[in-house]
Amino acid sequence: MKEIIESFFRERSLVNHQLASYDDCIPSGDNSLSRMEKIVRSIRVGTDEEVEDEKGGLIKLDVIDQDIIIRVKNIQLGEPTIREADGSDHPSQPMECRLRKLTYMSPVRMDFTIFKNGVPTQPEKGVQVGNMPIMVRSRRCNLHANHIAGDRVLHPTTSDEDRKMWEELLRQKGEDPLDPGGYFIINGTERVLISMEDLAPNRVTVEINKRYAKKTEVAKIFSQRDGMRKPLTVEKRRDGMLMVKISTAGTTAIPVVLLMRALGIENDQELFQAIAGPTETFKFIVANINEVKDNEEYTVDSMDEAHGWLEKKFAAGQQKEYREARVNQLLDRELLPHLGDQVEDRKKKAIFLGRIVRQVLEMAITSRKPNDKDHYANKRVRLAGDLVEDLFRVSMGQLARDLKYQLERHHNRKRELKITSCLRPDVLTSKIMHALATGNWVGGRSGVSQLLDRTTYLSALSHMRRVTSPLVRSQPHFEARDLHPTQWGRLCPNETPEGQNCGLVKNAAQMIDISEAVPEEEIRTRLDEMDVFQPDDWTDGDRIHVNGDIYGVHKRGKNLVTQFKNARRRGAIRSEVSIRYDNVNKDIFINTDKGRILRPVLILYDGAPRLTQKHLEMVGSGELTFKDLVNEGVVEWIDAEEEEDLYIAPRPFVLPEAVPEGNEYAGRPVSHSSITWLNLGEPSATEANLQAKITLPNGTKTDAVFNVPLLYTSEHTHCEIDPQLVLGVCASLIPYPEHNSTPRVTGGTAMVKQSLGLPCLLYTSPSPRDKRQSRMPSSA
């Protein structure tokens, strides 16, 4: 399958996931509604009122005599430039920034419009608000194939002529054509953003808390929407009461039944059905309903009474209007915001809350096991684009508040309001630059930005493919450090440091991709075409969850999953969208969010791969690309959650060391590099018909044809492209790692990065990088 692997790396570099994440974050010609643009349009300073995002961000001034608001939108990222001492600007190149100890960055511009009493003034377009560091080889970089040749756009992945021209232009600019990019240049030093593991948002995890020898069943969810994260906890106390804790409500616990009544479920039977699971859970549900009705502390039996109880708890002593507004804010914005923030979304939240409670009760009666927190379906990887997005959100908020303050000062002094005279670009620039230069990120994290390890080419590659865990290094965390089955093919099982970082600092496997967010509207539209509907009774049918949000139900869930996968294999649905059917709870989970580690596998249909020998020949000649194989339904990207439903063969067959007995040229050695699979893709085949190139004792080369049994059956759904792809870039260079003990291979991955080669041929070139070479190379 080497043709498929070579095709994959012709399309993507080894740091493609970092580049793609950063490109998705920044604005560009084909990404006008980027993450940075969404942040700008969501700005609300001086007001809490909901406005349309299409009109841009909103800054409202606190002045008495007039109603003044500022609208901001249309963020643009210019060409990377250097400003000289005389004030002139000229395009910058990464090598120039390295030599002159400068930062490789671009100007950030936006459009502002001031409204006075609802009347707009002349818009100020293209106002520079600061500078943004640019990732080397990203879409905005001057070395990118779209910009390096002037007006001509090069296509180095599909055209040999363009590739040679691109490499020559890189050499002229002092760059190494083999350098993959994926890092920043800050004050002349190369810095890389380390990918970080994080808990997946909008997913319910059930666990048992042990305090003072007491066990409590607890369910947790981090509900996230537009960068806003609201944790929610449901726990079953020792007396059987089911209580909810909302992070923004402090330590106050709310009975689940009371909260569900406040959300609109007033009928006891409907409330019971929303929670009911196995028969053993019925007594707990009835007891909670009666407790909320009869206990003097609550005495709640209707939605109005539930609202009244919440008003007393969270806005006691305030006016009626304020109390109602506080409860509405709690129910709409602070409770499970990923399900919506409108009044009509409350019923859906009540149903979702009932599902969480059911899982807690099922664990209480031991019919459900605690969730595996180390399962990679419950984790997401935050890449450079996600980290820059967090940093830009905080920096932009700080800039907007500073602009509001400066405009109010100008207005109070009776000066003309001009954005260019009030805005201070250094506010945004200094905030971003400080974080990238020191590694101290927003949220209190440190070590996010690190100096790129340039000891060798391999050490730099490994550094940019590193994935770190946020767990404290001084604690044991035995389970978190262990290899997990869901890391197969996603994270290298061998490449990890020795010592306290062991198992917490990992490296990506060779052939992976990390998902970017796919708009949910695309999937919802497709589901509507597949007869998914929104019922009045959410307990009827198989529920469909899109990124944790209950979207609708379907009468035949398994048929929907099959239909959805077929559409994805035809290219009608994006390849990074995953789907899984939960047989136990009759739920369908669809994930379109970012940060899921995906790996490619071959699709099997009725016990035969869709890949044929013709496909391999066309891929080898360049007629087909790896992307074409995905769009034709030959190869499929899968994440850890969807893999739970699959049956994957580790290899199609076991190749003998020599031609088997009973065949011509028996006993002659064979290898994978000389094998042609003649009946590849043939339906109902039980043996693989192989043709091997062999060498006879007299030196003559010929072909030997023989059969070996296939390892996959009609029950298998997929097959690995190559088992060796489970290793990372360092472990894959160790000869025969399967014949060594694991600790030795782990030590070998560290030594591989220390092997010095020839750094460059032109030693007189003014390179700012540390040059390391062996003064006494081994003669062996």
Task: Give each language-model segment a name.
Residues 766-770, 774-780:
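Positively charged, low-complexity/disordered segments
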Residues 1-502, 506-765, 769:
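Conserved N-terminal architectural modules of multi-subunit, DNA-dependent RNA polymerase core subunits
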